[in-house]
Regions:
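Membrane-interfacial terminal anchoring regions of lipid-handling membrane enzymes
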Residues: 1-90, 98, 161-164
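Soluble catalytic domains of membrane acyltransferases
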Residues: 74-165
Length: 165
């Protein structure tokens, strides 16, 4: 958890009681207006092919690899045998109550033998500040959005690319 643990727990309880399982629960999580999402996603699309993005992505993935190794020191994973028949690309989902959840998912998938792992995250996570924001933008992530144009055009291309590579 990034924020105050007790506040996060209370926010999770509230979200669950309201059946809002995709609600932001970390204190200070970005909440974006439609025009902010538009600008953020347009920048994401345009910047992804830039040299600077590729360098930052490489650095973020190296950090994430080291981080998932550290997660392994304090995390026990069970049920990996259920993945033994998966022989090709796959889509793994989880309900991200915390932007740190992808570290756990990456660790489990690496332990299961998968090497290329892309994480789907909320578009608003691209607006996070600091180290966690950097990782959300560059560690092989694919934003999902409530914006119809993005989900109809860009997101399917990202999924196809992740499954083909």
């Amino acid at each position: 958890m990034i924020g105050d643990r007790e506040q996060v727990y209370e926010n999770i309880k509230t979200a669950v009681s309201l059946n809002q399982l995709n609600s932001k629960v970390e204190p200070g999580d970005p909440k974006l207006l439609r025009e902010d999402k538009e600008a953020l996603l347009r920048h994401y699309i345009d910047y992804r092919t830039a040299y600077g993005y590729c360098v930052k992505k490489y650095i973020a993935e190296a950090i994430f690899y080291a981080g998932t190794s550290a997660v392994g020191l304090i995390t026990q994973v069970s049920g990996l045998e259920n993945l033994s028949e998966v022989k090709g690309p796959a889509i793994v989902t989880c309900n991200h109550f915390s932007p740190l959840d992808p570290a756990i998912v990456r660790f489990a998938m690496r332990k299961a033998g998968f090497t290329r792992i892309s994480i789907v995250n909320q578009d608003s996570n691209l607006a996070m500040k600091g180290f966690v924001g950097y990782m959300q933008r560059y560690a092989d992530t694919m934003p999902v959005s409530s914006l119809k144009w993005f989900m109809e055009t860009e997101f399917p291309n990202q999924i196809k690319n992740a499954l083909d590579n």
